[in-house]
C-alpha cells in the first residue's frame, strides 16, 4: 500500500536551509541536484516506508535514514502517510531534532 509523504514545516525549513547553504558554497546547479536527491529519497518512502533505523530512544516510532552520506531524514510512518519531521545536513545531531522544537 502506498502512503502519502508529507513534509512537516520544520522539514521544509530544513530543506530551504540546506539549499541556501549549498547554493552559497557551490552554486545553483549543485543545490538543485542535492535537494532534488533528498526530496526523491523522501518521496521514495511512499512505497517502502520501513527503511532506515528505528530510533524509539529519541521518540516512539521515529525512523532515520541516511541519504548518500549527505543528510539524514527523520520520519514517522502512520497508517496512511509518512511524515518527514526533519532533514538534517551532514554532521547535525538527530538527537536534538525534537529538543530544538521544545517537544
PLM regions with names:
Residues 1-35:
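Arg/Lys-rich, positively charged N-terminal/basic patches that mediate binding to nucleic acids
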Residues 6, 66, 83:
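Conserved beta-strand segments that form the floor/walls of ligand-binding pockets within enzyme
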Residues 7, 38-39, 45, 88:
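Generic leucine side-chain signal with a strong bias for well-ordered alpha-helical environments
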Residues 31, 53-55, 96:
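Short, hydrophobic secondary-structure boundary micro-motifs
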Residues 40-67:
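A short, surface-exposed loop/turn module that caps and links secondary-structure elements
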Residues 71-103:
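Enriched for short, Lys/Arg-rich terminal
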Amino acid at each position: 500500500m502506498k502512503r502519502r509523504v508529507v513534509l512537516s514545516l520544520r522539514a521544509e525549513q530544513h530543506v530551504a536551509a540546506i539549499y541556501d547553504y549549498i547554493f552559497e558554497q557551490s552554486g545553483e546547479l549543485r543545490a538543485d541536484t542535492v535537494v532534488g536527491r533528498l526530496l526523491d529519497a523522501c518521496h521514495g518512502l511512499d512505497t517502502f516506508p520501513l527503511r532506515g533505523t528505528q530510533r524509539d530512544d529519541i521518540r516512539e516510532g521515529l525512523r532515520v535514514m541516511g541519504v548518500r552520506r549527505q543528510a539524514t531524514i527523520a520520519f514517522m510512518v502512520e497508517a496512511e502517510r509518512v511524515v518527514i519531521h526533519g532533514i538534517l545536513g551532514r554532521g547535525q545531531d538527530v538527537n536534538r531534532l525534537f529538543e530544538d522544537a521544545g517537544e
